[in-house]
Amino acid sequence: MEFKEQVLDLLADVAENDVVKENPDVEIFEEGIIDSFQTVGLLLEIQNRLGIEVSIMDFDRDEWATPNKIVEALEELR
């Protein structure tokens, strides 16, 4: 499975919403697709499923605003 597809699947699971796969440029925080509690779950799932540790200190909502931006950020951290 392609890395981007893995990340989008993970996002869809955490958000409980497939819109992140259908529109990877959707603003997930502005649109209320992911809230602050789900953000913590997202970071844990990234570590568990992808083996990429992301500190809450490294998390920036602007840099992680869309699924595509999240994929880019995680590719840099791989």
UniProtKB/Swiss-Prot annotation:
- The UniProt record lists the keyword Chaperone: no
The post-translation modification note in this UniProt entry reads:
4'-phosphopantetheine is transferred from CoA to a specific serine of apo-DCP.
Q: Which InterPro entries match?
A: ACP-like_sf (IPR036736), DltC (IPR003230), PP-bd_ACP (IPR009081)
Please give the biological process terms from Gene Ontology that the record holds: cell wall organization; lipoteichoic acid biosynthetic process
Asked if Disulfide bond is a keyword of the record, the answer is no
Pfam family of the protein (one) = PP-binding
- According to the UniProt entry, which residues carry O-(pantetheine 4'-phosphoryl)serine? S36
Compartment(s) where it occurs, according to its Swiss-Prot or TrEMBL record: Cytoplasm
Enumerate the GO terms in the molecular function aspect. D-alanyl carrier activity
The record's keywords, sorted A to Z, are:
Cell wall biogenesis/degradation, Cytoplasm, Phosphopantetheine, Phosphoprotein
Q: Name one GO cellular component term.
A: cytoplasm
Q: Which HAMAP family match?
A: DltC (MF_00565)
**Protein name per Swiss-Prot or TrEMBL:** D-alanyl carrier protein
Species of provenance: Staphylococcus haemolyticus (strain JCSC1435)
